[in-house]
């Protein structure tokens, strides 16, 4: 299995410094995401509908014993312009892609901000293995440092369940991230691009 999770830039000493300094020291500098490798992908539709909204939510975050409210996409966290959260960057203003519009071809979608969020998040995963994925482990502080502190108290958090489901249910081999196969397997009832809010996101 290809491991897509990125390592903490700067090695263990930089990671330790990040934890000590806190939320504004999760990383920094210009980030250039490496190209995706491997033949299996995660589902774009599920990401857009079920996972990306988590990054915009106001969440309770505990850092150095102090609990505050913030979003993952906030400046000082994982915002793509002012965030210091390492390679994982989120464009907070990314607009949903109309997957029912035939003009939105895969090539066009891959140039949009929502897709950039998708690739950035997928880069923090080990496809098919939520337990090994930094996108799950870091906000839970599961044997890994996270400059943003504890975001989710346990794996029972509904947000974690959605992220785990996304990672644990990759698109079938040989199909790309826009495969409509996932519309019926990852949503109830089946995802309808013309009425995206009519379906519920499946989760573990």
Where are these regions (language model features)?
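Bacterial N-terminal signal peptides
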Residues: 14-24
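Electron-transfer interface patches adjacent to heme c in soluble/periplasmic c-type cytochromes
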Residues: 70-75, 79-80, 84-204
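Bacterial Sec-dependent N-terminal signal peptides
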Residues: 22-46, 183, 187-195, 201-204
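Bacterial N-terminal signal peptides that target proteins for export
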Residues: 2-16
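Residue-level "hotspot" positions that anchor or transmit function at local structural transition points
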Residues: 14, 43, 126-127
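Electrostatic cytochrome c docking/interface patches
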Residues: 34-66
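Composition-driven recognition of low-complexity segments enriched
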Residues: 27-29, 68, 82
């Amino acid at each position: 299995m290809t491991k897509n999770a990125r390592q903490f830039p700067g090695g263990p000493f930089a990671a330790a410094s990040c934890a000590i300094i806190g939320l504004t020291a999760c990383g920094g500098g210009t980030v250039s995401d490496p190209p995706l490798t491997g033949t299996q992908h995660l589902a774009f539709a599920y990401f857009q509908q079920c996972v990306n909204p988590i990054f915009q939510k106001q969440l309770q975050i505990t850092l150095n014993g102090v609990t505050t409210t913030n979003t993952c996409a906030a400046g000082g966290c994982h915002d793509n312009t002012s965030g210091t959260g390492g390679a994982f960057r989120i464009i907070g203003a990314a607009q949903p892609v109309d997957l029912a519009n035939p003009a939105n071809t895969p090539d066009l979608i891959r140039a949009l901000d929502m897709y950039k969020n998708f690739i950035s998040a997928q880069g923090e995963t080990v496809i098919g293995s939520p337990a090994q994925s930094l996108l799950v482990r870091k906000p839970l502080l599961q044997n890994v440092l996270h400059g943003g502190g504890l975001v989710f108290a346990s794996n029972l958090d509904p947000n974690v369940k959605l992220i785990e489901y996304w990672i644990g249910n990759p698109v079938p081999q040989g199909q790309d991230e826009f495969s409509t196969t996932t519309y019926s397997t990852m949503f109830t009832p089946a995802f309808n691009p013309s009425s995206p809010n009519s379906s519920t996101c499946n989760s573990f």
